[in-house]
A protein has these predicted regions:
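Active-site nucleophile and cofactor-binding loops and adjacent substrate-binding regions
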Residues: 8-9, 167-169, 193-199
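Active-site substrate-recognition segment that forms the wall
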Residues: 40-49, 57-97, 101-187
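C-terminal lid/capping helical subdomain adjacent to the catalytic/cofactor pocket in oxidative enzymes
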Residues: 185-191, 195-220
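Helical element adjacent to the flavin cofactor pocket in flavoenzyme catalytic cores
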Residues: 5-61
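Conserved Rossmann-fold dehydrogenase catalytic segment
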Residues: 1-2
Length: 220
């Protein structure tokens, strides 16, 4: 399926959920708090912006909007700049050491250069994680395992008849110009969004730039 590729030994790959959990634990250790299942229904700008949820409100000196594809219609100006796109992943049953080495020598992580890219790597227990299928409807296909299995075996025919143990989907935010977006709606309301499926590294870079701006330390 592929005519060639670039092997970059300077890059690495990681377990994104473990990264998220580790960062949440670091935030808690610094005295921060995370409130899940707290849908924001309105943001009122001002000298002290007010963020309203379905159960109450929060007044803050600074607000950062980082909901990406999950912002909905909360801020129409931002919603018009990002298209939620469903990206799906399947995980095979654990592969034999020989088969795992055959399909991905060196335990590398791979992605292709398309905007709606495919990506794949091995898990610690030698499952192949194969992701992609970005579509612009934001909807998960009814036969997710079947659709992703077909894509996987086009790349790895060696995996014909391999069981698929897990399948899931989530939204990624595709920017209208295919570039990440950051900026301000006012002096104290910032936003960062639209990573087009490449968010693990850029989210951290853009968060740092935004934090420096808020702290008055930005020289970029």
């Amino acid at each position: 399926r592929y005519l060639g590729g670039l092997h970059n030994t300077a890059n690495g790959h990681l377990h994104p959920l473990n990264l998220c959990i580790g960062e949440a634990q670091a935030l808690n250790a610094l005295g921060g708090a995370i409130y899940e299942q707290s849908r924001v229904v309105a943001i009122e700008p001002g000298a002290l912006p007010v963020v309203r949820t379905e159960a109450g409100s929060i007044t803050a000196k600074t607000v950062v909007l980082a909901g990406n594809a999950y912002m909905g219609g909360l801020v129409p100006k931002l919603s018009k700049q990002v298209l939620p796109s469903a990206s799906s992943v399947i995980a095979t049953a654990p592969l034999s050491p020989e088969l795992a080495q055959q399909i991905l020598p060196g335990d590398v992580a791979v992605c292709d250069p398309r905007t709606a890219l495919d990506y794949f790597r091995l898990s610690a227990d030698r499952r192949l994680l194969f992701g992609g299928l970005s579509n612009y409807t934001g909807m998960e296909p009814k036969n997710l395992k079947g659709v992703m299995y077909k894509k996987m075996t086009q790349v790895f025919p060696e995996l014909e008849n391999t069981a698929i143990d897990y399948a899931w989907s989530g939204w990624i935010g595709i920017g209208i110009n295919r570039m990440p977006q950051l900026g301000q709606l006012s002096d104290n309301i910032h936003y960062i969004q639209a990573y087009s499926g490449h968010g693990v590294a850029p989210t951290h870079m853009m968060a740092r730039v935004t934090a420096e701006k808020i702290a008055g330390e930005s020289t970029r």
